[in-house]
């Protein structure tokens, strides 16, 4: 998440400085990636599009934009170390991402700063966004059944709170619904069907729950926004613990 944000900030900053920002620019990220991307996109007047986990969905957006000509892809990423700083491919490109990060490092070095200094600058500019993952491993046939039971129970009963945070809305990507818990309004997510639940929480926090596609695990992605780095890290660890406790 942090390396992707450093690259995104650099790309958008350079395009603005050199007047090379395309019309209708778009950043694309997976739903489990950092919410700092929303703040960066807003600062540069760039649209942010969210897709399901898996870089193929970012590739689909690129193809869609190329065919329609209505939008221009600028940068795409997912939290699991996947980035693509161009439209020449349809999958994540690690060598290109590393080269971009080296360019970002050189940019900050020219100012007497490190990459970490640059990240601190971004935290101070956009807020202290922190993200993490908690997992439960449930092996074998029984484990697979247990994982599905956890997802079924979660769909049947929505908590009012997760830790210190109120649950504001729930997105069920399997049912293609987003329910606002205050108004009761239900709208479509607009994304393909997937066995994923996403909880929008108070104070810019969130939690996303999904079974792993490659391991006998259920994954709990969480994100928070704090006023300080230490404060955000503490909030994150507390939320991870409360989420595991709730879904056990």
Task: Enumerate the predicted regions with their spans.
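Phosphate-binding and adjacent anionic-ligand microenvironments
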Residues: 6, 14, 18-210, 219, ...
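A generic beta-sheet turn/junction motif
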Residues: 213-215
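Active-site activation/catalytic loop segments of kinase-like enzymes and analogous catalytic loops
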Residues: 10
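Active-site beta-strand/loop architecture of penicillin-binding DD-peptidases
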Residues: 223
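Hydrophobic, small-residue-rich alpha-helical packing segments that form membrane-like cores
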Residues: 1-2, 13
């Amino acid at each position: 998440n942090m390396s992707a944000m450093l690259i995104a900030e650099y790309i958008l900053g350079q395009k603005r400085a050199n007047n090379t920002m395309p019309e209708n620019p778009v950043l694309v990220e997976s739903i489990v990636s950092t919410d700092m991307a929303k703040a960066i996109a807003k600062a540069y007047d760039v649209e942010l599009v969210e897709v399901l986990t898996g870089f193929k969905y970012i590739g689909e957006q690129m193809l869609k934009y190329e065919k329609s000509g209505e939008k221009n892809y600028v940068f795409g990423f997912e939290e699991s170390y996947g980035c693509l700083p161009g439209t020449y491919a349809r999958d994540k490109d690690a060598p290109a991402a590393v080269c971009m990060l080296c360019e970002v490092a050189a940019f900050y070095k020219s100012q007497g700063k490190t990459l970490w200094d640059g990240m601190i600058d971004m935290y101070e500019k956009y807020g202290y966004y922190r993200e993490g993952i908690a997992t439960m491993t449930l092996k074998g046939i029984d484990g697979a059944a247990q994982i599905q039971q956890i997802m079924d129970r979660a769909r049947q009963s929505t908590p009012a709170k997760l830790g210190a945070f109120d649950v504001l809305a729930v997105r069920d990507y399997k049912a293609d619904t987003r329910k606002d818990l205050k108004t009761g309004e239900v709208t479509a997510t607009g994304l393909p069907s997937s066995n994923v639940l996403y909880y929008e929480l108070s104070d810019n926090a969130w939690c996303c729950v999904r079974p792993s596609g490659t391991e006998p695990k259920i994954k709990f992605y969480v994100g928070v926004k704090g006023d300080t780095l230490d404060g955000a890290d503490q909030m994150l660890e507390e939320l991870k613990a409360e989420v595991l406790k709730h879904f056990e």
